[in-house]
């Protein structure tokens, strides 16, 4: 019998715990991060209306990256999501790291979004 829980199951439990307390509004939407082994995705979500206001990922055609699974790609995604948020008039967000550790690609995306003008 396998008793060890997977890393993703533990991440999902952490994410659910945080999401019970954290919610995005129209005035201050939620910046959600999802990372896979090959790509990273960022969405700005209004949870009250259930609408995605802006998004960016390493799969975007606007983003010209050679490697999609490293911190430099995450930095470019952070800059792009902040630019798209600014176009929609969004400056303040709540950061939702998605149960991931604030380290590596997640930290690179957050720092780039902050430098590009998002406040959190």
Swiss-Prot record:
GO molecular function: 5S rRNA binding; structural constituent of ribosome
GO BP terms: rRNA processing; translation
Any one GO cellular component localisation term in the record: cytosolic large ribosomal subunit
Stretches assigned to coiled coil: none
Key word Transferase present: no
InterPro entries membership: Ribosomal_uL18_bac-type (IPR004389), Ribosomal_uL18_bac/euk (IPR005484)
Endoplasmic reticulum as UniProt keyword: no
Keywords: Chaperone, Ribonucleoprotein, Ribosomal protein, RNA-binding, rRNA processing, rRNA-binding
Role played: This is one of the proteins that bind and probably mediate the attachment of the 5S RNA into the large ribosomal subunit, where it forms part of the central protuberance. Required for correct processing of both the 5' and 3' ends of 5S rRNA precursor, which is does in conjunction with ribonuclease M5 (RNase M5, rnmV). Possibly folds the 5S rRNA precursor into the correct conformation, thus acting as a chaperone.
Subunit relationships: Part of the 50S ribosomal subunit. Part of the 5S rRNA/L5/L18/L25 subcomplex. Contacts the 23S rRNA and 5S rRNA. Required for catalysis of RNase M5.
PANTHER family per UniProt: 39S RIBOSOMAL PROTEIN L18, MITOCHONDRIAL (PTHR12899), LARGE RIBOSOMAL SUBUNIT PROTEIN UL18M (PTHR12899:SF3)
Family of this protein: Belongs to the universal ribosomal protein uL18 family.
HAMAP family: Ribosomal_uL18_B (MF_01337_B)
NCBIfam families registered for this protein in UniProt: L18_bact
Official protein name in the record: Large ribosomal subunit protein uL18
Species for this entry: Bacillus subtilis (strain 168)
């Amino acid at each position: 019998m396998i008793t060890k829980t997977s890393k993703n199951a533990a991440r999902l439990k952490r994410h659910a715990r945080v999401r019970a307390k954290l919610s995005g509004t129209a005035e201050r939407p939620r910046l959600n991060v999802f990372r896979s082994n090959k790509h990273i995705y960022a969405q700005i979500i209004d949870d009250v209306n259930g609408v995605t206001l802006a998004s960016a990922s390493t799969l975007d055609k606007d983003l010209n990256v050679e490697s999609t699974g490293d911190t430099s790609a995450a930095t470019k995604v952070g800059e792009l999501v902040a630019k798209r948020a600014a176009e929609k008039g969004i400056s303040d967000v709540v950061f939702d790291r998605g149960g991931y550790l604030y380290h590596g690609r997640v930290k690179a995306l957050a720092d780039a979004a902050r430098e590009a003008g998002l406040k959190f």
